[in-house]
Amino acid sequence: MLYPLSHRAKQNQICYNDYIMKLLSKKEEKKTEKEKVEERREEVLAKGRKFKYPFQWTRHRIVVNTILIALVVFAMIFIGGWLALYRIGMTDQLLFNITKVLPLSVANVDGEEVRFSDYLMLYRSSMTSIERQSGSQFDESSFEELRSEYKRSALTEAEKYAYATKLAKASDITVSQEEVAAEFDRHLKIGGIDRSEEGFIKIIENNFGLDKSEYDRMLYLTLIKAKVEMDIDTNANKIASRVETLLAENGNDYKAVADQLGDEIIYEETGGLVDSRNIDGGRASEAMKLEPGESSGRFVSMNGDGYYFVKLIKKTDSEVDFVSIKVPFTEFAKQFATLKEDGKISEYINIADPAAEIPQSE
């Protein structure tokens, strides 16, 4: 049975309840204060994230877009350059500079890549000389035919240099920078004229469109090919030795030696005084060093296609009259022709052979 609480008991109960509520209220106040701090902190961080994450996303998007644009531009440049070089056949200075930096090939000879830069260097040097000296003599149609002819010639020459490089590697034949420098110095003195390096470089720039490094490259290729030809052409070496022996036995009578050797050598007479600066494989320059009646020893032609012997007849300060015997190199040409016949030369550009387009008369 329940009894009602007395008045005093009721008051005590109320006081006790108030006390409990106060304690709970204090706890609630303390807890709320901490929560307020945490909530405020979370609010600040949330606002920061609100600006931070969109910015990070935007920056990421910019980076991705930049990379994509760069790739597209690079692809367009690559495709454009490829079309210009391999399909259109452009030969301008910009593309030439690109081929000097990038290892691009224009053909392959028996496994040896042919440098595109070598082909363009040979072609541009030939065409620059023609354009600056006699370009006005040709109409557009004739000039286009001339371009095709020189492109074919330059590509074939570049292929020969590549094959010579392959043979040089196999036989451990090298050309040093010192040899190239010595050959350059020899060119400075062609015709007995002591030119300055600066003046000579100006001449080759004006006449052939070549700078010093490109001219050195041409000298290197000529030297390496000449060394290879001397190494593999045992027949030419034997004939040259016979020429030396016969000249000694016949008192340097070039005509008598030529009669004995016949088609094995090439005998030439200038028939009078010629400019000592003639570009004739180095014969005029070599003759300028001699005295009348004196004969040179064996020397390799400046373009590396054979041995020369020269005898001076007479000379002035700037002209020479001489006779010469040439022992041509033939072995390299035979090997190169065999490669062509066997299909071991692959070309990556299409250049028609002008000689093949000439109709044969019946």
Enumerate the predicted regions with their spans.
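Subset-of-secretome marker
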Residues: 130-138, 151-152, 191, 195-207, ...
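Peptidyl-prolyl cis-trans isomerase
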Residues: 246-286, 314-321
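Short, low-structural-confidence N-terminal segments
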Residues: 3, 11-145, 282, 286, ...
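Proteostasis/folding factors centered on peptidyl-prolyl cis-trans isomerases
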Residues: 199-230, 281-326
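N-terminal targeting/tethering segments
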Residues: 16, 93-210, 214
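Sec/Tat-exported extracytoplasmic proteins
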Residues: 123-130, 134, 154, 158, ...
